[in-house]
Amino acid sequence: MKLLEDRILKDGHILGDNILKVDSFLTHQVDFSLMREIGKVFAEKFAAAGITKVVTIEASGIAPAVFTAEALNVPMIFAKKAKNITMNEGILTAQVYSFTKQVTSTVSIAGKFLSPEDKVLIIDDFLANGQAAKGLIQIIEQAGATVQAIGIVIEKSFQDGRDLLEKAGYPVLSLARLDRFENGQVVFKEADL
């Protein structure tokens, strides 16, 4: 997605060897017009897949997921990373390791929001090692629902997340694919769209 790649080049900042900071439009401050375009692109791609729910993990996946769900006219569910006293029965959980934060969290979704009839599109901000998506898949499958596909805003193609998910049989669609960082610049791999 050229619009996204251009924004990454303009406002993204490389930290170290493998971290791209995009807090000015995705991971802290949100550019709603860009997120709306991202949501439209995902919705167009998956319009024929019969999606009934969009699922993400808090926090930075929420913006692209909500605009995708809006464009598909389906509910969006986000997995919570912190235990909540109001979520006390029928909770589906999985362990998720965060590459950026270097911590493992128990993420959860109330089981009442997913059913065996649901066809789910997972949307997330980044794909690195695939652990967030893997945790969401576990939760969705605990409910008996089906993961139709995984939509990623920014994929770190130099990490193994995509291979892990595709080898497990889950289609991955990434709007921007980072091949590497070179001389302080992002080098893109051809994106899926």
UniProtKB/Swiss-Prot annotation:
Subcellular location: Cytoplasm
MF-aspect GO terms: xanthine phosphoribosyltransferase activity
Pathways per UniProt: Purine metabolism; XMP biosynthesis via salvage pathway; XMP from xanthine: step 1/1
GO cellular component terms listed in the entry, alphabetical order: cytoplasm
Domain of life according to the entry: Bacteria
Keywords: Cytoplasm, Glycosyltransferase, Purine salvage, Transferase
Catalytic activity field: XMP + diphosphate = xanthine + 5-phospho-alpha-D-ribose 1-diphosphate
Binding site for xanthine: L20, T27, K156
EC number from the UniProt entry: 2.4.2.22
Binding site for 5-phospho-alpha-D-ribose 1-diphosphate: A128, N129, G130, Q131, A132
GO annotation, biological process: purine ribonucleoside salvage; xanthine metabolic process; XMP salvage
EC class (word): transferase
Pfam families recorded: Pribosyltran
NCBIfam families: PRK09219.1, XPRTase
HAMAP family: XPRTase (MF_01184)
Subunit and interaction comment: Homodimer.
Family: Belongs to the purine/pyrimidine phosphoribosyltransferase family. Xpt subfamily.
Biological function: Converts the preformed base xanthine, a product of nucleic acid breakdown, to xanthosine 5'-monophosphate (XMP), so it can be reused for RNA or DNA synthesis.
PANTHER family hit by this protein: HYPOXANTHINE/GUANINE PHOSPHORIBOSYLTRANSFERASE (PTHR43864), XANTHINE PHOSPHORIBOSYLTRANSFERASE (PTHR43864:SF1)
Protein name: Xanthine phosphoribosyltransferase
Taxonomic source organism: Streptococcus pneumoniae (strain Taiwan19F-14)
Gene name in the database record: xpt
